[in-house]
Amino acid sequence: MDLSRIPAQPKAGLINVLIEIPAGSKNKYEFDKDMNCFALDRVLYSSVQYPYDYGFIPNTLADDGDPLDGMVIMDQPTFPGCVITARPIGMLEMIDGGDRDEKILCVPAKDPRYTYVKSINDLAGHRLDEIAEFFRSYKNLEKKVTEILGWKDVDAVLPLVEECVKNYK
């Protein structure tokens, strides 16, 4: 898979998210650049599972040295390697392993059920709480600590994506 062919921002206001982990999975897959395929990184130690499809924005480099993370709210899970053109609606800021780590929350651009969702404020607060709780607790049994800093709305996302695209280049 040639990731260089997948633009981070295919159109203004949209991003591409390459899915590594489908919703409902306890398996944490990661794209292995050396093998050029998806590989099982680990199985989550705790009883939680990924609430939505999770992956990364290709051709970006975040402060933690990895591509920028993205989570796409979907009604049905996709699969590792699926590229979803998505509309970012906000981001969860957290600390993971001592490093700042942002999780970009998105909705699929090609799903009419989410055309009204433009911001995290368009979602039920409980949904955001569930996502934050997942990231707060998913590493507990590994004796790793994550700290949730809070949610930022959509206006904070695109400048971060643009910065991470520049960092990659």
From Swiss-Prot:
UniProt-annotated binding residues for Mg(2+) 2: D69
Predominant cellular place of this UniProt entry's protein: cytoplasm
Catalysed reaction equations from the record: diphosphate + H2O = 2 phosphate + H(+)
Subunit structure of this chain's protein: Homohexamer.
Binding of Mg(2+) 1, residues: D64, D69, D101
Listed GO CC annotations: cytoplasm
Enzyme class: hydrolase
Keyword check for Transit peptide: no
Protein source organism: Synechocystis sp. (strain ATCC 27184 / PCC 6803 / Kazusa)
InterPro entries: Pyrophosphatase (IPR008162), Pyrophosphatase_sf (IPR036649)
Name of the molecule in the record: Inorganic pyrophosphatase
